[in-house]
Design a protein with these regions (language model features):
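Hydrophobic, proline/glycine-rich low-complexity stretches
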Residues: 1-37, 144, 203-205
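Extracellular and analogous surface-interaction loops
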Residues: 30, 118-120, 163
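Short, positively charged
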Residues: 16-17, 35-37, 54-55, 150, ...
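HotDog/MaoC-like acyl-thioester-processing domains
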Residues: 23, 27-28, 32-110, 165-168, ...
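A conserved acidic, glycine/proline-rich C-terminal tail/linker
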Residues: 147-176
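A conserved, well-ordered hydrophobic junction motif at loop->secondary-structure transitions
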Residues: 120-142
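Extracellular/lumenal ectodomain signal focusing on beta-strand-rich modules
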Residues: 23, 117, 156-158
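Short amphipathic
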Residues: 112-122
Length: 205
């Protein structure tokens, strides 16, 4: 609904074209607990023909406690390739002036260690027929030792999605641990498909 109102989506695109997130970074100044009441707002950044930034803000008790920066691209769902708004039949609205820091770009680590594998079940895929974005953080966070979560929370999360992962594919999971930072990489058949970087910060309840 939001995409239609802002001019970035229309019903004729259904099943033909869709947006996928390529990079995102989340910064939190404090943890969010179960039953916390939070408010989410969003705004669109200055876009190009193929890159569409979007920013999200998290407020709790009238205080801004978090911000998410994301980059989206429009793809042809049948060809599985990036496409232009014009090809999708879109006439985009006036380009906003908002320019902010982009999500962090992550790179493969030389000293990464293979720690596990994960076979993607059917229940993990979305309507685009690839591993749903919500599962990447779950898969990555499960590789962090339980002890790391004691008196710590994730205050910084960055994810780079490099190549789609399909149902039943086997992901080789690599971990690099540097102080309070954990970098998790997922490879399929020797090709890097995603990188997740998580920083843990100490807190007291």
């Amino acid at each position: 609904a939001d995409g239609s109102l802002s001019g970035f989506y229309k019903e004729s695109m259904k099943g033909k074209y869709g947006y996928v997130v390529s990079k995102q970074s989340l910064i939190l100044t404090e943890p969010i607990y179960e039953d916390d009441e939070i408010t989410l707002t969003t705004e669109i950044g200055h876009y190009s023909n193929v890159i569409f930034p979007r920013f999200y803000y998290i407020e709790k008790e009238g205080r801004r406690i978090g911000e998410c920066r994301s980059i989206w691209t429009l793809i042809d769902l049948k060809r599985r390739r990036i496409t232009s708004p014009k090809r999708a039949g879109l006439t985009l609205p006036d380009n906003p002036d908002l320019v902010k820091e982009e999500p962090e770009t992550l790179f493969t680590q030389d000293d990464r260690q293979l720690v596990s594998t994960y076979t993607v079940p059917y229940s993990d895929i979305d309507t685009n027929r690839h591993l749903n974005n919500t599962h990447y953080l779950r898969i990555a966070s499960n590789l962090i030792p339980v002890e790391a979560y004691e008196n710590h929370f994730m205050d910084s999360i960055s994810i780079n999605y490099k190549k789609e992962i399909l149902a039943h594919q086997i992901i080789e999971l690599y971990l690099t641990h540097i102080d309070d930072t954990y970098i998790i990489e997922g490879d399929v058949e020797g090709e890097n498909c995603f990188i997740v970087k998580i920083h843990m910060k100490e807190y007291t309840k």
